[in-house]
């Protein structure tokens, strides 16, 4: 186990336990897993990783430290954040809590690929990266939190996503922003509600904490600059879409142009993730009068307003 402090940089090994305060930790993984000591024996998790194997590695860390898992607090229901729930709940009997609509998605994971695809998902969309195993989640309420915890609403990336502030003033930020490296590589990060996402990022810029732990960026004592970088990237994508819509164009052609111009590779997974996000951009741009849409020869076409 290592300790990270403000200003620290370094390479962490996958599933290494990193301490960020007296009682707060995270487990280095594709989507960081928060761990908070509640007393000498009991701990809770903030998210659980992307699958059974992640859950197994978390269990090994718990056993190595003599800790007992009492609860998992899910920030939202994306598969890479709830994938370890079923295994850990089965092994430890811990409770699982998820906020709002996310609780339904956590209890019924088929909802995620169905929502992304817009219909019954075919088998190539029913895999662990888009659909976790079902688990017995309860609705997250303030009463379900350990003493001193605070819920931070972070809507935008997904329906009812939240973060948490702990008694040691550590803020776990879930997926409300991504690292510069991630955005430079993938360009179009997943967003459900662009307007809400931008408002969340503006709020995050004002936050102060002893340490911030985003799921897809390095832990840091400062977050405002990275939040602004994410805002700038959203605006860049939005402007690119508006430019593509100079002439009437259908959704599939917009998506093709974006993949080609950003050098992205199409796959089933990327089609639904980026495709859903581009639809969300179009909705936001339409509602803010940047683009309009209509029908021609039984096709919906988008055009700059």
Task: Report residues per predicted region.
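C-terminal regulatory/interaction regions
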Residues: 243-305
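Positively charged, polyanion-binding regions of nucleic-acid-associated proteins
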Residues: 232-248
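Short, Lys/Arg-enriched N-terminal segments with co-localized hydrophobic residues
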Residues: 3-13
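Active-site HxH/HxHxD metal-binding segment of metal-dependent hydrolases
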Residues: 55-145
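Conserved beta-strand hairpin/beta-sheet module of binuclear metal-dependent hydrolase folds
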Residues: 11-65, 163-175
